[in-house]
Amino acid sequence: MTAFTDSSYYSQTFSELEMQDQCIEGVEFEGCHFKQCNFSQASFQRCNFVDCEFEQCDLNLLDLGYSKFSDSLFRDCKMRGVDWSKVSWPRVLFAAPVQFFQCLLDDASFYGLQLPELIVEDCRACRADFREADLSQASFQRSDLSGAQFSKTVLERADFRDAQNYHIDIFHNRISGAKFSRYEALSLLNSLDIELSD
């Protein structure tokens, strides 16, 4: 299969599609499962994903211009450099409509997004941009956040237990009620310009 010829697909499974660099526009997917598909540098323009799952897919540099997501899950996917700010998000969100498990999210951008309860678990999100985002009650458990950017980010009641390599300035982010593992939480003191000794 080289292209989606219908305008909508329901409860279908797509396996091992090779669609890198292709443009898919105005297609609705509901209850669909994408497994081991290659969408690297592809473009989903004004598409709608409802209750969909992506598993072991290559989504590097995927362009999601004006597409919509609801109750969608990404598991064990490569998603480097995806700009999530291009997605058409609902104006009011009580919980993030996407979840990430065991994904590579390096260099992804979530800049300025309102995504409360976002799940980024067991992921690598090196150099990801979370600045000015509302990620209250998000979960970053067991994720590598080396070089990830947090500034003016709402992280109240977020869960960073067993996350690694994060740098969060406690003066420029809202972290009230957030959970941290004891050892890694020492990195929060970096913004205090103090010297620790045993």
Across the structure, where does each feature detected by a protein language model lie?
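Tandem repeat scaffolds
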Residues: 1-198
